[in-house]
Amino acid sequence: MHDPFYDIFPRPPEPVWRTGEMALITIDMQYMDAHPDGWMGRAAGAVGKRDVLTQRYEAIARALPRIRQLQDAFRAHGEQVLHARIAFRTDDGREAGRAFMPSPHEQSIARDERDDEILSEVAPVGDELVFSKTSSSVFSTTDIERVLWNLGVRHLVFTGLVTDGCVELSARDAADRGFRVTLVEDATCSSTPEAHEDAIARMTDGGFIVAKSTEETLELLESMSRALTPAGVGDAA
């Protein structure tokens, strides 16, 4: 739903893509919540509700090759490829915030060491940075902001899951901290199409976060490489 407040002012220009300032970040594409055999799937199975995650896993399957394509392209262009995951330091997750603290029922679902692992299709290569979080936003419980500034990153391109949860909160936090933010809408996913589409609409309503398809993102990356900045595009930051 559109907020008419944004009609008062001109829409912000889309961000410039500059070499050396880009980072692709993939949120929570790990066994715990992105694989049917992960902790979330096991928890659903324990109460006979595996079917509620069917659309989620179908969306993940569609997004994975797109994320990999984007990762390979960013690597080829010498831009940063980053990863964020949920990873507790304790068996029961007691160090997490209340929103992430497992309920008594969830605590009974045994955790597997694979749950922390990022899916092999989009796994880190070499010494790519992995940020382990115990919160929805990667900015809340990691040092990612300091690292991004140290790396010279000013523009974050988001992929991963879920669009209406950890992706949205991380993207909004990034925008609040002065980073340019692009969301790859067909390389992010939610448990339902409706939740995904609603989150995209909310995030992009004011123009401070821009949504692009995988194809459009790859074209912008190529354009940046050829011309350093894409022709005819304004700068939002």
Give residue ranges: language-model regions.
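Catalytic-core segment of enzymes that process non-peptidic bonds
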Residues: 83-87, 91
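Active-site-adjacent betaalpha module
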Residues: 1-23, 36-44, 69-77, 88-89, ...
